[in-house]
Amino acid sequence: DSRLSRGLGDVYKRQTIDLNCFKVDTLLRAVNTDRGMMTVYTKTPIELIEDVYSTFEERLTNARTKLGRQLTYAEKVLINHLDSPNQPLERGSSYVDLRPDRVAMQDATAQMAWLQFMTAGLDKVAVPTTTHADHLIQAKVEGKHDLLTASKTNEEVYDFLESVCAKYGAGFWKPGSGIIHQVVLEQYAFPGGMIIGTDSHTPNGGGLGMIAIGVGGADAVDVMTGFPWNVRWPKLIGVHLKGSLNGWTAPKDVILKVAEILTVKGGTGAIVEYFGDGASNLSATGKATICNMGAEIGATTSIFPYDDSINRYLHSTDRSDVAELAKSNQEHLTADPEVLQSPEEYFDQVIEIDLDKLRPHINGPHTPDLAREVQELGAEAKSNGWPLKISAALIGSCTNSSYEDITRAASIAREAAKHGLKSKCRLLITPGSEQVRATITRDGLLADFEAVGAVVLANACGPCIGQWDRSEETNHETGTPNVIVTSYNRNFPKRNDGDPSTLAFVTSPETVMALALAGTVDFDPINGSLQTADGDQIALSTPEGIELPPSGFDPGEETFIAPPENATELEVKVSPTSDRLQLLEPFPAWDGNDYENLPILVKAKGKFTTDHISMAGPWLKYRGHLENISGNLYLGAVNAFEGYEVGYGKNLLTGETQTFPEIARSYHEANQPWVVIGDENMGEGSSREHAAMEPRFRLGLVAIARSFARIHETNLKKQGMLPLTFSDPADYDKIDESDRLSVRNLTGLSPGEKIIVDVTKSSGETFSFETTHTFSEDQIQWFKAGSALNVIRSQTQS
């Protein structure tokens, strides 16, 4: 019953797709491989979805019998994608093999994923795969200018991605096509399906009832090479939504409230499943917003059941065949009735939120779970000495750039313009996709923003991921705090603009618009008033949103490149002198010995996110060059030992104070392996596997933390490192800068067994502490082979 691949029955077909009166003759390409059949084109073929739905009935019936109970919706989708239906399903304990329907990758993480895939020795990808050029476009002037600049600056990388997609049978969405998650929602997501993507906000697809999970590039390579994806069977958190949103309250406020309740690590190892009448009252794109930002609570993914709003969105995005097919399978695309009647019996945790009572929220700074209602921010800012003045307001990102989001914010801008009001700070708008941009341009919504002084950026991630050049606005040297408000998802220090003094707050697009008009965080959009040029005071009206464009979506410019019919002879060139791309050498296998006398490269205090470990922003250009990107290793880490600036520590070989990447390079050149120590939730944030590949490249062998974020822990395992968790979190405090660590009994590494770490202090005194790990039997083979990719390579080339 293996799901090695799902596709069309014949080799080549041509289908005409009607995109709201815009006819696109799209090549559907089905590629025969020794592992099955796959298809790449601009939408998910109905045949693939029919195949997925065809196994629901039998699999779910058998699962109910096996488990002796009814099923939640998330369980239904996962069970239907099991490689083998006979695997043990113990929440938070057993590991399972899954067969995702497709893979999506963004251009920053895709480089390393493709470089890894190229070493596997296969001619084609085994499942439908797409690469989306959205991360490498830096915002500076405005959309067209920035896109042209990016096309020149990143020409080598774009050429590589386009050619590697062509050679191996994948689709390529060109720069300007839009943010990966918005494009996936518009083109590929479908209820009951499963996708993995090399970006942590892949769960955006849960808004259409899809299991959509962010992974590292090595995980994607597993699936692209035809292997199942191995993951721990998740726990389940149920969120019961009651009532309806009203007034200024938006879907964004739901997830901001959930983040407050669960915190940034409360969802770790769990899928969050939303249900209830309140869930049905949300639009599909509103659902996507909530699922998208579920990454900020550490959740494996989030999901909503199929309902009428999802049906409407599918029809509006020219997928009526998918909508009708989903409707006819609706019983499988929602939780069983008994689950909805007694959710406490089926979920590990249940949260209830009354949407009628929910009020607009704004979270931050520096962490997405520091929440309060919008009207409370002014007083809190004053008490903390934060600036009240807003330096920039930003609307968009993969979290909040749907048509409905834009219409609600634009209604505020339109009203303000009628009274002669302008934004009192820099206002930047990011359309989520070319389709959204073309549609909101046609419908006059971008003009509404421009009337109050907004600048429209490229259809890309931009400032949300640090691709924002605002060097003329801020001075990193002075350390002068400044405040920005965004409709984004993350607000870690330096995340958006590289400035550690920037205080970033996340909220809904309409609240961002209101605060931009006020120019201060000390403003209540609901009860406050704004002064016009004539001295009159006006209160802002309640935002008015339109769920879907009445005239349909305008697809805009064609930005998809399908792979050619036969490109196996195509050569993917990587210059040996390139500073952007570098072919990979396999990491060495474990030598069979314990790790002895390892120095500590860094012991990090507090947040130790992937942004702290491997910064984005200006470093994004090196994402395809492992040696060069390693120049940012741990630059954002706060040293737990006193007397150091951020990103600095002591080189124990020389006694010098250096940056962490300088120390790592020194240890590498001296062939000195080392260990890294983390605090709580190490690796929180993005899916970037560079945060695991860089330390491995520089001879990092072990990472020990009080706890790990899911994706980062998996990425460390994939690259052959040993992530260990303190059995007693207090042992973290016992480790000193000059200590040497030895990891014992690695020959006995097995699931569930504790690992002993011996510590030798500079005085000669020794002590030991226990650690736990989450390795499965299969994952232990990754460790022994040196990486998961080494295991794949040995099997594909045998």
Residue ranges and their predicted role:
Residues L530-E547, E713-W782, L789-I792, Q797:
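Acidic, glycine-rich flexible loop/linker segments
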Residues D1-Q15:
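Single conserved hydrophobic/aromatic residue that forms the stacking wall/gate
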Residues L148-K152, E156-V157, E162-G197, E273-G276, ...:
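Accessory "access/gating" subregions that flank catalytic or transport cores
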Residues I49, F56, T61-P234, G624-P673, ...:
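Long, structured ligand/cofactor-binding scaffold of large enzymes
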Residues Y41-T44, P191-A323, L421, A460-P463, ...:
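Mobile "lid/hinge" segments at catalytic clefts and subdomain interfaces of large enzymes
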Residues T42-E47, E57-N62, G68, V77-D83, ...:
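Flexible inter-domain linker/hinge segments
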Residues F275-S280, N489, R665-F708:
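Extracellular/luminal Protease-associated
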